[in-house]
Structures are given as C-alpha cells and as structure tokens.
C-alpha cells in the first residue's frame, strides 16, 4: 500500500472524448508536497508517512513542530496528513512528491471536506418533502413534523433527523478515474466532481477497492 498525496482543488472543466461524449473533470494541483516524517511499527504500532504541503511562516509554528521540521531539514508546512503504508513503501524524509506519483487511467480515492452550508432546515439537510401547502397547515410548511413520542420515552432519540448545521464534513469519494496528468502545470485531471470549495486541500490515494468490469 503506497502513500497518498495532499493536493489543492483548482476547479472544474470538461472535455469531449472520441465518441463526442462530454466528460466533467476536476483539476487538482500538486505543489510543494514533501515527506515530513515516518511512523514505524516498532515505535508507533503502525507504518505511515507524514506528508506536508504549503510553506508556513516560522513565526506561526509551535516550538515542538519547529524541531520536527528542523529534523526533516525542510521548511515548515501548513497542512500535514498521515498515510498508512506497507513496510516496503517507505520514502526518505524531505522527498518531494509530484503528479507523476499517479498515472492516467488509474482509480483513486479522494478525501475532502464538504462545503459548509450553515444552519439548514430539514428539507435542505435531509431531503424531507415537508408538510402540506394547505388543508389546515399553517406556518409549519417546511417543518420536519414530530420529533418524539409521549411521556414515554419522554426524550428525542439520538440521531433524529432535524434542522442543524449542514456541511463541513470529511467525506471520501471512492474509485474516481484519473483522466490525465499534466506534469508541466502540476495538475491531475480527475473524472467527476470532488467535495470542497475551490483552493481547498484534499488527499488523493490509490483506490482501496478493486473495480469490477461489467460486460
């Protein structure tokens, strides 16, 4: 199992293939992505690489992290993430990871944070149909209805679908296909959409599940 990389979402575009079919693409940029540290089975109980991206002012780094970056002999990074790996896939500290870490036609898993929607009602948040528009219903047309039962159990059960904060959740989209890799522009073109707003950071790693070909 190889390490993944941290990339930045640039935006979306579309291209046409040989059959005239339109393919939606998400562009992600891989720039200044380096190995910051190692996690070993003997010391930490598992094998992993710590990957960092985007330089950070030294004045904004805590003293413990200053020592970490000093030991790695690299500039401080803004974003850090661990990737579990197998023992044979360790990479030297301070090694840079580029877009050629992946190839066109490969399937990857994308982990990102969804766009925050703020406080949302039940219809937007959970796709409820709402109450009737007339026939005695007033004020509560977009309400979610009853939230509980009676004196017994006398409470609202945990997990009840109600209005609340929507978005800002970490999600993983599996088995997205890489359409092309542009080494000059440091871009990876991925088929389909990816969670998150423009310029947000996400992780790209090899697909963990095999793709079955349907004939």
Curated annotation (Swiss-Prot):
Q: Which Gene3D superfamilies match?
A: 3.30.160.810, Translation factors
InterPro entries according to UniProt: Ribosomal_uL3 (IPR000597), Ribosomal_uL3_bac/org-type (IPR019927), Ribosomal_uL3_CS (IPR019926), Transl_B-barrel_sf (IPR009000)
Q: Which UniProt keywords apply?
A: Methylation, Ribonucleoprotein, Ribosomal protein, RNA-binding, rRNA-binding
Q: Name one GO cellular component term.
A: ribosome
- N5-methylglutamine modified-residue sites: 151
Record's Pfam families? Ribosomal_L3
What's one GO BP annotation on this UniProt entry?
Answer: translation
What Gene Ontology molecular-function terms does this entry list?
rRNA binding; structural constituent of ribosome
Its post-translational modification remark reads:
Methylated by PrmB.
Q: Which NCBIfam families match?
A: L3_bact
What does this gene product do? One of the primary rRNA binding proteins, it binds directly near the 3'-end of the 23S rRNA, where it nucleates assembly of the 50S subunit.
The entry's protein name is Large ribosomal subunit protein uL3
> To which species is this protein native?
Rickettsia massiliae (strain Mtu5)
């Amino acid at each position: 199992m190889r390490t993944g990389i941290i990339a930045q979402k640039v935006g979306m575009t579309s291209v046409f293939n040989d059959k005239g079919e339109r393919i939606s693409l998400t562009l992600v940029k891989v720039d200044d992505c380096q190995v910051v540290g190692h996690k070993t089975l003997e010391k930490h109980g598992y094998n992993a690489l710590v990957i960092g991206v985007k330089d950070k002012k030294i004045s904004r780094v805590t003293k413990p992290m200053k020592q970490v970056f000093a030991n790695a002999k690299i500039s401080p990074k803004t974003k850090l993430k661990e990737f579990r790996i197998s023992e044979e896939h360790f990479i030297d500290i301070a090694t840079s990871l580029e877009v050629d870490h992946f190839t066109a036609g490969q399937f990857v898993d994308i982990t990102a944070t969804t766009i925050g929607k703020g406080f949302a009602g039940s219809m937007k948040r959970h796709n409820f149909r709402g109450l009737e528009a007339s026939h005695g219903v007033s004020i509560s047309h977009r309400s979610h209805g009853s939230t509980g039962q009676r004196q017994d159990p006398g409470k609202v059960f945990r997990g009840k679908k109600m209005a609340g904060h929507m978005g800002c959740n970490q999600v993983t989209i599996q088995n997205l296909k890489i359409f092309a890799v542009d080494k000059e522009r440091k871009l990876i073109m991925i088929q389909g959409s990816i969670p998150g707003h423009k310029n947000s950071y996400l992780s790209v790693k090899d697909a963990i599940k095999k793709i079955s070909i349907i004939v």
